[in-house]
Amino acid sequence: MTDGAASSAPDTSRRALAFVTMVRGDHEMLARWISHHGALAGTREALHIVAHGSDPRISGLAQGCSQIVLPYDPEGRDFEPRRVAMFFGLVAGLLGYYRHVVVLDTDEFLVAAPDCAPARDLAGYLDNADLQGVALSPLGFDLVHRPSVEPGALDWTRPITAQRRHGFMHVAYSKPCIFRRPPRKGGNQHRLRDQPMQIDPNLMLLHLRFADKDHGLRVSRQRSETVARFDAAGGGHRIGTWTDRERHLAQAIADIEASPCPDLRLADRRRFSIRQMELYARHVGRVLCRRGRSAGYRLPDEWVGCL
């Protein structure tokens, strides 16, 4: 068994699962995030919501969760490095009380594949996972709105995968986010310092950034305005994914409309995971996003209701 693999008996003095996210606005997405991950953890007490600035609506939505309110810096000084340092420090502390700490953005949802063992017992599955480093990566799936067959607006109160089924496997969202041990300083949410990439195709990270065209446009414009303010202030925010989002949304929708989108099967997930881990090892820990997106796929019928 490799270093860091699970012992035969989990430490029951610690709870099994905690989930962590950071949020500013986007209340519909947060409500869904809390509902979904609270069910996975078995209690809202295991959800740790970091609000970037005081927001009464977030406080109301997150009742029963652990809440931290951080001061909002309108200049965005060192935004991303400070955010990553906060996450890593919080993970290190929470691992004293939980066996697994999962860090996700508010538009990211951990889902156990319904055709595999973790769907029946996620905590037990993670306890017994043969982990090669400090964190496990679920397989990222970028859920994209396909208006030709999904014409309606997304209803956040209904099952998401009953309304949106199409998208791309993507290495950028195959993030090392399920922590069993504290990460070292110097990495980020997509790559951990001096750590292997270990993608588990039995676990999926469904990314909802582009799951609804209208919602995606609204959030994209808000984020672009925020980055423009940060740039004007010269705060060195180092945010690399918030600009030009409208163009990326339009391109993702065009690409998914042009794809035949066969059903996504376990063999496809395994093949993609192995390929991305090989590329990561070959390129000495670099995440190759330009070579990290699959063709379009459709989530099979058994995924309806998973989120």
Identify the residue ranges that each predicted region occupies.
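N-proximal low-complexity "stem/linker" segments adjacent to membrane-targeting elements
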Residues: 1-35
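Residues that flank catalytic or metal-binding motifs in active/ligand-binding sites
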Residues: 15, 105, 199-201
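Short acidic, S/G/P-rich loop/turn micro-motifs used as interaction or catalytic elements
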Residues: 26-27, 108-111
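Short, acidic, metal-binding catalytic loop of nucleotide-sugar glycosyltransferases
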Residues: 35-45
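Conserved acidic residues
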Residues: 45, 99, 107, 134, ...
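Short internal beta-strands
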Residues: 48-51
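Active-site-proximal specificity loops/subdomain of glycosyltransferases
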Residues: 55-104, 112
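Catalytic-site signature of metal-activated, phosphate-bearing donor transferases
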Residues: 81-85, 112-307
